[in-house]
Amino acid sequence: MVVAVEYISKEESSDVAEGAASVQHGVTGILAVQGAFAEHAAMLDRLGAPWKLLRAAEDFDDSIDRVILPGGESTTQGKLLRSTGLFEPIAEHIAAGKPVFGTCAGMILLAGRLDNDENVYFGALDAVVRRNAYGRQLGSFVATADFGSATGDFAVSVAPGERVPESAASESIVLKDFPLVFIRGPFVAEVGEQATVETSVNGNVVGLRQGNVLATAFHPELTDDTRIHELFLSL
């Protein structure tokens, strides 16, 4: 079971080592105090990318070169980030310009401001986010949209089932027809000049990128589509 695995490396798992050998990056730290961290780990397993669950400050070591903030309950996660001592090392990671990916609650944690909550966490995005914008659990839904801000003749389209090129970070990439799973998700109420809109649904912005910060209001980890995780690993 994925949830039982704390860390996968070349030394500890020869099965994963073959897939991980071609991945040109270190370990992805997945915040694991609450929420859908196991699903993100399963996605990285499929891509042969090593990961480590972050439950306490001592889990955040020099091997980690990128961080995932999973979906869940943002207020609870915010409190646990402080009590576990993980807030400071993750904040330093973000301030250093290293890659971070937030989904749903993770987008809230990365927001520069919330328009319906006085809390501010990492403040990494030049954007105002609205918590629980899509209402209660019964308001959850699935949509399909292209993901990526690239337009014109130089945009590289990646269709469902295709792999994102390893050079994606330096190319104009559009992920075609990506499945968007919303569970009481937020959306972006205001987008500042530094952030780039990656996708929208019904006029609401639900995907942003700002440098090495990637954030979605939806849950790509709850689908069978690995393309956004591939894009994140290319940052």
Regions from the PLM with identified roles:
Residues 2-19, 140, 153, 160-179, ...:
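C-terminal and late-domain segments of enzyme folds
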Residues 32-33, 103-105, 125, 184, ...:
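A secondary-structure boundary/capping signal
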Residues 1-83, 88-92, 151, 158-166, ...:
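N-terminal beta1-alpha1 cap of cysteine-dependent amidohydrolase-like domains
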Residues 68-69, 102, 216:
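Redox-cofactor binding/interface segments in oxidoreductases and associated redox assembly factors
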Residues 51-52, 100, 213:
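Hydrophobic anchor at the start of a short beta-strand
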Residues 73-152:
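Cysteine-nucleophile active-site neighborhood
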